[in-house]
Amino acid sequence: MKRFSAQYIFTNTGAPLKRGIVAADDDGTITGVEDTGGVLSEKESLEFHNGIIIPGFVNCHCHLELAHMGHMIPPKIGLAEFLRLFRAGRIAGQEKIISSAASADSEMYRDGTVLCADICNTTDTFSVKTNSKIKYINLLEVFGIDPEKANRRLNEIKMVSDIAESLGLSWSLVPHSAYSISLKLFSLLLAETGSNKITSMHFMETRAERSLLENQSGPLMDSYIESELIDGRPETVRDHVAAVLEAVTRSGNLILVHNTYADRDTIRKVNKRGNLFWCLCPNANLYIEDHLPPVDLLIGENCRIVIGTDSLASNNRLSILEELKTIHSFYPSVSLSDLIKWATLNGAIALGGEDKFGTIEPGKKPGLLLLKDIDLDKMQLLPESHITRLI
């Protein structure tokens, strides 16, 4: 058994414990948590660290199969142009895709991730996940704006789900976004997802989504025409609210990803769904659109916030801590305890893993991370703040 202490322990079950003690078995299961009142009376067989002990991170939005695309697409070009270059650059050899994914998986684990919702369009990362130390929830993503190809698109992703099932991997079928799926494909997908426990969807990532849905115009529409993805006017949901409340399954939790241009009216309307989580991937938002989601608005509307990294096509690292640093630098009023809760407990709840992850309490196996080089007086992250895995 191992026993750890630090300046503070954020258990997510109550107030931070000053110089508390957490004990764990060799397999990482928490066996005890002690509130010392800030006074350590014994130091024998105890590892004391200068920093904050927190549960392992939960990444609620990742694209591991795009790990080979690091530095291929220039930053700050907008989503429409990003997608155009993405379609051209995604193709790569199987060996490169798998080796890049394996490297990214190892780095993500070192950076503290214990549970991850990963978007899959193919089976490319399945071999990596069967040997990973990270628990993955595979969100098998379907997209297709051409209604004539709707049945084919659904059948393709169902073939991916068959392989995931045969390997014993956790999976759900999910839509890509409101703007990339025809009404017909939404309808077909809805019939297949009535028992989903977890669904996710890219949401309000760019202003161009609204112009496409409402007027069939703008940069995304131009991109579809240029890429010959559709012939004529697309048949889409009328707006983002209709996508959430009418087109997407009401079953289980729904994670809305990015929310870069979310507005108060839309937030209030879609929050009526219930079981809704708002995933922030700020570094990807800055990389693609050079714009951040309205974090203060989401907080003010009592949205349950979770954290994701997106992909190495739109980010330099798959590090949850780096995402938290970015949020803290632009929104310094957000408390460190809230940031940690978003990146741990909220994510665990969103992914249905709160029985094991997200809190430091007996019987759970959340992983233990040491958050170092922070401003302990102000409880703020610094550019040099970093994570060390204890378990």
What are the residue ranges of the model-derived segments?
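His/Asp/Glu-enriched, well-ordered alpha-helical/loop segment
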Residues: M221, S227, A247-R250, C281-A284, ...
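Alpha-helical scaffold segments that flank or form the walls of functional sites
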Residues: A23, I52-I53, H68-K133, N155-S166
